Amino acid sequence: MLFRDGLVMYDRETDTLWTQVDGKAVKGALTGRKLEVVPSVHATWKQWKQLYPDSIVLKKRGIPRSAYEGYNRDPNRTGILGRQRGDKRLPPKERVIGVRTEEAATAFVEKDVRDARLVQAEVGPLPVVLVAAGDDHPVVTFNRKVSGRVLSFRLPQDAPAVMDDTETGSRWSLADGKAISGSLKGAQLARAPAYPAFWFGWLGYFPNTALWKR
């Protein structure tokens, strides 16, 4: 089942319908309630292993390739209904990373983030950093505020899968957002609520979204 071209789930206890994109209950006994967002990383297996080489894999039997492979590659297929939208800022099937707060939403074109490698921005009141340390690394997104202080970051040349803040020189792991050296060692960056999507799908839920430009 789809709602605004996004997946709809149901819970077995109440049969309430929940949207995947924003976690809201749209029909049923729990209508109006909202699921807590648990931040995650969307990555290929190769990218995932760069940050988490000791991962345990949960694998189930199934077809050897994605059932959506053809759909993902066809730029003219936009959702089940193929609905057209008036917003022409990006091609409908452009892959974006959407970041949202209660006050605002911003889309970042994934290939632009990868080209820049590190992007710092504000989404409403939320200062964020999006990082792709290399082509073989996933894009990870963190809140830049630590203990009430907003930090700025850069990627060092001497080590992979880390970033340094320019205020204290502390070094931070991209795997979990923890400071591993420097005066802030032990401090933790929180994951920012980021969602990978096609542009048309993100627009379906956030039609007034901002679009980050390089």
Predicted regions: what they are:
Residues 1-214:
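Mid-to-C-terminal functional-domain signal that highlights helix-capping/loop sites
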